[in-house]
């Protein structure tokens, strides 16, 4: 089922015109060197950065959504955001609960998401007292809550700009599990990141960007090829098969 359509979308000189489409249940990864345009693309998909062309979410152009309607359809995690110091975690999360959601269902969702992200003991803590990794997980919990299927049946899309930043190995695994669960509910996720092996293992589709252009897009195995990646990143990559999985390495000098 079609979820998102991009028709000749561009953002000034920061993102060249391209077209694409996203169906339901997919995890799509945006990869490319720093400055490639990944954050620009995500912000435009979120409706927060004006773009030329047309972005259609759930059959309706982003330009025709009211703010409160768009907030029910998608959630967006920016790459950086300062913590609001005079606020405990539980109050911050409450700002993201969908309008009209059942209070008990919201409490259950908060408990579930925070347990998965290992945040339960942080709920009463002030945001200013969180470490960088804790704050990142709180931000993730908030955007998950905004579009969590049990309390927001209208939700369609989660947009995450470098969500794994600041997370340790166990926390990354926990985030992976939540993303898989979210996609299995018929929603889709678009993620930017720099861990090529993580993308190789987790993504259903990959969009490869460089210098403000979407150069290649398609199924993961089609895009994550050593020759394609080497040309874009200007690094000599190799792909190895080990234990029934593929792994990307750089070639030794």
From Swiss-Prot:
Q: List the disulfide bonds.
A: none
| The protein's role, per its UniProt record | Part of the ABC transporter complex BtuCDF involved in vitamin B12 import. Responsible for energy coupling to the transport system.
Catalytic function, reaction form: an R-cob(III)alamin(out) + ATP + H2O = an R-cob(III)alamin(in) + ADP + phosphate + H(+)
Main location, first listed in the record: membrane
GO MF, any single term: ATPase-coupled transmembrane transporter activity
Q: Which organism is it from?
A: Yersinia pestis
| Keyword Transmembrane among record annotations | no
Against PROSITE patterns, the record matches this protein to: ABC_TRANSPORTER_1, ABC_TRANSPORTER_2
Record text on subunit structure and interactions:
The complex is composed of two ATP-binding proteins (BtuD), two transmembrane proteins (BtuC) and a solute-binding protein (BtuF).
Bilayer disposition of the protein: Peripheral membrane protein
Location of the ABC transporter domain:
4-236
Q: Which domain of life is it from?
A: Bacteria
One Gene Ontology CC term in the entry: ATP-binding cassette (ABC) transporter complex
PANTHER family in the record:
METAL TRANSPORT SYSTEM ATP-BINDING PROTEIN TM_0124-RELATED, VITAMIN B12 IMPORT ATP-BINDING PROTEIN BTUD
Which top EC class applies here?
translocase
Q: What is the protein's given name?
A: Vitamin B12 import ATP-binding protein BtuD
Signal peptide limits: none
Please give the family membership noted in the entry.
Belongs to the ABC transporter superfamily. Vitamin B12 importer (TC 3.A.1.13.1) family.
Give the residues the record marks as binding ATP: 32-39
Q: Does the keyword Transferase apply?
A: no
Q: Where in the cell is it found?
A: Cell inner membrane
Q: Name the UniProt key words of this record, in alphabetical order.
A: ATP-binding, Cell inner membrane, Cell membrane, Membrane, Nucleotide-binding, Translocase, Transport
EC numbers on record:
7.6.2.8
InterPro entries per the UniProt record, alphabetical = AAA+_ATPase, ABC_transporter-like_ATP-bd, ABC_transporter-like_CS, ABC_transptr_BtuD, Metal_Ion_Import_ABC, P-loop_NTPase
